[in-house]
Amino acid sequence: MSDEAVAAIRAGKAVILPTDTVYGLCADGYREAPALRLFQLKGRPESMPIALLAADVDVILDAVPELRGRAGVLARALLPGPYTLVLPNPSRRFRWLCGTTPEKIGVRVPELPPVARALLDRVGALAATSANLHGAPDPASLEDVPAELKEGAGAIVDAGPLPGTPSTVVDLTGAEPVVLREGAVPAAEALARARGALGR
């Protein structure tokens, strides 16, 4: 399955992958067209951001070198884990992922199931969003993924049931961390970890 999923990503197709929270709908993050296909498949407005997902923080830092420094310290303190971190993107890289805020980028480095980790190690960073129709419940299993997304995917990677609670989204672009969405990690814990990384 890993070879099939790698081939699908390299061909510009979407794939359905397990993460540490829910099943994700992913595509090559380095190219605009495959990433935009994710918006079309799930009916998500392109004005709304999606994440750049990788197996390791170093992959994210290589993709967005401006994150080295304060943002990199914060990323290493919180990742890998069930977080989406919103970080500064001064060079406006990966604009197709950033919606109406290209000066910010959301990144994910999950605690991946081994089958997904093996895939990410081969393809680098992916554009990623949850494998549901826009506004629908997050999928904790492949049975929860809509048929139209399965039909539109070039490959599907099954890791069985997942926790089903989405990542906690933390905005780290300002002087103080802000929780934008409470998910798998309680807001108070997320803020405490972020402030601890800043020495506060």
Regions from the language model: what does each represent?
Residues 1-200:
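Active-site-adjacent structural elements in enzyme catalytic cores
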